[in-house]
Amino acid sequence: MSGASSGTAIGAHLFGVSPEYRVLIGDEGAGPSKSLSEVSFSVWYRSRAARLVILCLVASFLVPCLTFLIAEAVMGQTVTTPLSLTLDHWSEVRARAHNQGVEVRKKKWITLCKAEWVMMNVGWPREGTFSLDNISQVKKKIFAPGPHGHPDQVPYITTWRSLATDPPSWVRPFLPPPKPPTPLPQPLSPQPSAPLTSSLYPVVPKPDPPKPPVLPPDPSSPLIDLLTEEPPPYPGGHGPPPSGPRTPAASPIVSRLRERRENPAEESQALPLREGPNNRPQYWPFSASDLYNWKSHNPPFSQDPVALTNLIESILVTHQPTWDDCQQLLQALLTGEERQRVLLEARKQVPGEDGRPTQLPNVIDETFPLT
């Protein structure tokens, strides 16, 4: 027994095995048994390989934990922009638009904020903003009259402006600080006027006071003082008496309508008329705000065709639109199917030479083209 123990001790010594390891494997000859903690500390202090193994195990546990904690911290510090804020509260944004009678879609909301409004070159940032100055600049571009306007973007910019002017609780922290009021310029104290002594320009002398009359005042005398009195007024020339009572001049719009009735054969062009400077009628195309107001304050043609028909008739009378204006008006107020039905019905009513609806295609296409 002692020989086996001595052989084990010699083998352990040759292969660098510590006595503690011999105790763990049951070598009774190595001395009295020790506790597991004592053996562990002994292995830690005496075996370099054991220390490396333990350090690797600890590192393999700590590295994933630290990575997870760092990722959580980075995600918690994500920068919030006005655009991302509206997307996080999209249900409230849609409810705000619905209360204004319009509909907005998330995909177009993102496209307008990141691309369309940025390319207007009015200072709109890609991440969006609640600044009323930037919103007003974009709104001015959208509501521009004629082909430069963007009626399809009106619901989106009005919803943006509503969030900025009447902000909910989640928008208030992101509102820009109000601008300080501009101080009014202080009035300058008037400087006493100095006498003109310039040698470049002659000084205008003050007018002399009127001279007293040379002759004594005599009311009964027919003579006048030619030096002080003004000559008597000469009687004005009497023109021929008016031949009849004068009628007030007609307004420009009435004159235009009268000329069109008196000269029906002359070629005329109907233009949307509005009063411009000096109360003169001028051509004004439909603005985006006009089309938006007409569409939002009137029912669709499918629901109430009579109301929309009356609206279009009143617009034709008051604005006298061109053919292109009529196409723009129908495109804004009607759907594609409704617009096609209206055009087909109108082509059936094209009058011929006898005043009745004609069936000749060339006359119909010339009078009422589809495009």
Swiss-Prot record:
Q: Which GO BP terms sit in this record?
A: virion assembly
InterPro entries from the xrefs? G_retro_matrix (IPR000840), G_retro_matrix_sf (IPR036946), Gag_p12 (IPR002079), Gag_P30 (IPR003036), Retrov_capsid_N (IPR008919), Retroviral_Gag-Pol_poly (IPR050462), Retrovr_matrix (IPR010999)
> Ranges in the Extracellular compartment?
73-371
Question: Membrane side Cytoplasmic: which residues?
Answer: 1-51
Compositional bias annotation for Low complexity: 194-203
Its Gene Ontology cellular component terms are: host cell plasma membrane; membrane
Q: Where is this region: Disordered?
A: 171-281, 350-371
Protein task: Plays a role in viral particle release. Presumably acts by facilitating the fission of the virion bud at the cell surface.
User: Could you tell me what this protein is called?
Assistant: Glyco-Gag protein
Q: Which organism is it from?
A: Feline sarcoma virus (strain Snyder-Theilen)
